[in-house]
Each structure stands twice: as C-alpha cells, then as structure tokens.
Amino acid sequence: VDLCVPNHLHRSFAEKAAAAGKHIVCTKPLTAYVGQDLPEGIADGEVSLTPRPEMLKVALADAQAMVDSAKAAGVQLMYGENWVHAPSFRRAQELLHSSEAVALEMRGWETHSGSHTPYAKLWRYNGGGALIRLAAHPIGAMVALKKAEGQSRGESIVPVEVTCEVADLSLAAAAGPEPKITTGWVDVENWGCLTIRFSDGTRGVAIGSDNQLGGMESHLKVLASTCQFEINLSPNNMLRSYAVEDGAFGEEYVMEKASTQAGWNTPIPDEDWSSGHQAMCDEFIAAVREGRPTASDGELGLEVTRIIYSGYVSAAEGRRVALR
C-alpha cells in the first residue's frame, strides 16, 4: 500500500494496511501534528497555538504507532525519502565508505519560491512550514548517512541534540517592490534552519526555505576528514539551456519551480532518475521481494519526526533540545 494521502491520515491508514498484512510505503513526513488530539470543529488557526512540546509528543506517538503496527504484523514500513536513493547520494556514500573518512560537517538545503497549494500556508493541513515540508529531505539524508557510517565501524551514530530557528521572512518583503516569492503564510514559517549534533560530536545543518527564485535547489554538502562531496539533486549541470525569451521551448518542462524558460536554465534530462524517485521505488520492491530491510524505513521516518518537532520546540523556547 502506497500512502500518498494527507498527513493526518498516515497513522490510521498504515495501521489498517498492516492489519491486512500489506507492506507499506509512506511519503514524508511519516507523521505530523495537525491537531489530531484537539476537539472536532476547532478553527484552523487554533491548531498552531498548541504548545510545541505537546506537538512533539503527539507526532512521535503517531510515528511510533506506525512502526510498531508494522512490526507486529510482520510487514515492512518504508519511508519515502528520495534523497537517500538519489544516484549522486548513493555514489557519495560509497566513496565515503571506501575512504573510511569521518563525515564531520554536513550542510543540506531544499529551497524554492513557495508551495503552489494554499493548504501549505496553514499548520492545520501541513503540520508546520518550510522545516517539515522542505528541510525534512536533507535531515533524512544526513541521519541515513551517519547511521551507515557508524555501521561500517560497528558502532551506532545517532542524533542527540538539535537547535533551530524558524521565521516567515516573506513579511519583510513588504518593504520592497511586489515580491515574486509566495506570500500570505498564515501560521507557518517559510524558512527554517536546524542544527543536529550527532553522538560522535559531528554536526549537520539543514535549511528549508520558500525564498528561492530561479527554480528548486536540493543540495547536500559533506565535509569529511579526508575528502568532501557536493551532492546536487537539483539543479544539476547535465544539461544547460539558454533562451532569449520565455516560451521558446513551447510547453516543455524545464525544472521544478522554474518560473521562466528565458535566460540560462538547467533542464533535467530524467528527473525521476536524478531525484532518486525511480531508484527508491525499485529498492522498495526489491526489499519486499527479498525480505530485507531498506535504508529508508519507518525508523528513519520516526527519527526525522523526532528531529523536526524537537526543532520546533527549540525555536519556540530558544534552547537546545535533547533527543534522547
């Protein structure tokens, strides 16, 4: 069962699928706080007033319930994090393993000009803003990379602490000309920056932002003790184009969130391949067929949920938050 449904349905649908003996693929985020513990009929704007520690508690309980129900039923819960399966990420991971180097610092971000759906502007429907919508990708990739690094040495490397800031930076745009980024965010952030401290003392910095014009950027930079890697999911320079005016290529798709065909662009030849979506689907099918776990499983989704909502606690209370 492939769960591509609103966040508030993830837990109930996963539990029903597990009870029916079905393997489960769930899109990110695994779970989110959308007021599921509040009385029915509560106004949309009241959901985001819930204290962030309570949000963390509820979202984690839902994620843990999904993991537990799959285990109890003997089925796999697979977490749809495409970054972990992108060919550029996998190759960097292979080279890092061969080098035996330590990933000391990771910087990852997913940014664009803002979601096209009005539902993304409300906590009630999304469970947060740019942090959960966008930064969840680099967070998941960093956690997976450090976990694999630890396993190669016969040890466990896990996230232990986060610090975070969030803001709606679009509010400042009112001081200038008409903005070209998405505005009108109701009660969610359009920018978030989260720092993870891992148990080996290394760090990861993840950014999610709706303030990026010119198309989506999905990047992860890994600074290791004897090498470094720049993982470019989008844009990448496999193909570059130049057009004098918009519409030069008719209705052809250039890249996600590119607002024009004019000027220099980076049309992606095969976005499903370079983004990792194709490899992710292939990996999930193979994992089920061979009866083996996958790198992006429910446990990874659970960890990302823990990190993100601990980040919201950190941002609200202005302090470091321990994860375990």
What are these regions, as identified by a protein language model?
Residues 269-281:
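Active-site loop of classical SDR/Rossmann-like NAD(P)-dependent oxidoreductases
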Residues 137-245, 278-292, 309-310:
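Contiguous beta-strand/loop segments that form the cofactor/metal-binding neighborhood of enzyme cores
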Residues 4-8:
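N-terminal glycine-rich "phosphate-gripper" loop used for MgATP/nucleotide binding
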Residues 71-185, 318:
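Predominantly a Rossmann-like dinucleotide-binding segment in NAD(P)-dependent oxidoreductases
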